[in-house]
Amino acid sequence: MEKLYDKSLTELHDLLVSKEITAVDLTEETLNRIQDTEEQLGSFITVSEEKAMALAKAIDLKGITESNPLAGIPIGIKDNIVTKDILTTAGSKMLHNFDPIYDATVMDKVYQADMIPVGKLNMDEFAMGGSTETSYFKKTKNAWDQTKVPGGSSGGSASAVAAGQVPVSLGSDTGGSIRQPAAFNGIVGLKPTYGRVSRFGLIAFASSLDQIGPLTRNVKDNALALNAISGYDEKDGTSAGVSVPDFTADLTGDIKGMKIALPKEYLGEGVQPDVREAVLKAAETFKALGATVEEVSLPHSKYGIAAYYIIASSEASSNLQRFDGIRYGYRSENVQNLEDVYVNSRSEGFGTEVKRRIMLGTFSLSAGYYDAHFKKAGQVRTLIKQDFENVFADYDLIIGPSTPTVAFGLGENINDPITMYMYDILTVPVNLAGLPGMSIPAGFSEGLPVGLQIIGKHFDEHTMYKAAYAFEQATDFHTKKPVILGGND
């Protein structure tokens, strides 16, 4: 049998429908692929072989039809998405043995689509980090170069897809945690509009910013995955009651007349020359396809990082109060009294970066500093939203780099939090405004992928996919493969 692990979702679907392969065949090959490459990559925290094989057998018995495009397709799940009977750790010692008794809403949708979860993917602890180096369990490697980070916090989700361990994965994005690792690994990653995908069962980091989204190796696959996981959920108070279009319906390659904005702030100081060049070339590609691309200004972007880290850390300090050593999660044995249970369980259960964010958030919310920090950050957030609204009054989309540079070395920035935080500078404004954003492959610098970020209007992922697909068809970046997937050096 030919190798299946680098095929698209559409190709796999055709093979399954024609009965050239079964869901059991595909799941077995996926599990073998994970086993063969996991030592090199470290993408998975848990592999759920028995459950995956049982599900594959049941799906084969039921039969796979043309009308169910994702039936029998294996999928990897970021380990902050709650999965019944599969350990869910959020990359933390605090939850190292947490076995949930319910599924997140996105998992319900995955099962409704007859997809097959094969395991839980490594991530920065509680999604706090940009390199997947803060995980309690292991350090994930970049699919293109195992001496480089895969990005974060959804590093496992990106590395696994780029290396062909799974054809699709779910990640979460609070300040760039889908788009940045997608860029670093040369794949497609989409953060949907806030409210498009249910957050019920997502272990919260910053509730006003978090959003679940798909990572795939091409645009159409990504649209298929978003079709499956989108929709209103009464269990999530921030879920939006908007209709879900078929995101694959308009992937024609025709974007004549589309108006695209390129903010000058996104190509400024700190952006690597090769990254800047790739974005400018992408702008020329869009022009050649019949779109107009014009320079605009998003003047408050430069305050995005400061506002984001105050808001996100403040929300995290509140959300993480629940991990106290009493109800569930890690409990210290080094205790004499109740106070020791709280203090020692949290001190021993949380890693350095999580503690740093809790401290920053608690400080920002404290009585003497609330107005100067948290309140002011909220006001800056409003200004950033207004900047986007002003541009979107005249344009359909905004483009720019996903990250200022390509992937950096393992260990290079782990002890320099400010440098690490600055890698989010181009992605956090999108979360602050609740907009959809995606990263698609757009070039290379010294053999490492460059990501192009596409930002859309609220609930207009449809137009983003349309433009991304047109760009993909006009270029060949998405066809390039890392060595681990059979590509050339």
From Swiss-Prot:
PROSITE patterns: AMIDASES
Active-site positions on this chain: 78, 153, 177
One cellular component term from this protein's GO annotations in UniProt: glutamyl-tRNA(Gln) amidotransferase complex
GO molecular function terms noted in the UniProt entry: ATP binding; glutaminyl-tRNA synthase (glutamine-hydrolyzing) activity
SUPFAM superfamilies assigned to the protein according to its UniProt record, in alphabetical order: Amidase signature (AS) enzymes
Pfam families: Amidase (PF01425)
Alphabetically ordered keywords of this record: ATP-binding, Ligase, Nucleotide-binding, Protein biosynthesis
Endpoints of the signal sequence: none
Top-rank EC class of the record's enzyme: ligase
Disulfide bonds listed in the record: none
NCBIfam families: gatA
Function summary: Allows the formation of correctly charged Gln-tRNA(Gln) through the transamidation of misacylated Glu-tRNA(Gln) in organisms which lack glutaminyl-tRNA synthetase. The reaction takes place in the presence of glutamine and ATP through an activated gamma-phospho-Glu-tRNA(Gln).
HAMAP family: GatA
Similarity comment: Belongs to the amidase family. GatA subfamily.
Name by which UniProt lists this protein: Glutamyl-tRNA(Gln) amidotransferase subunit A
Gene assigned in the entry: gatA
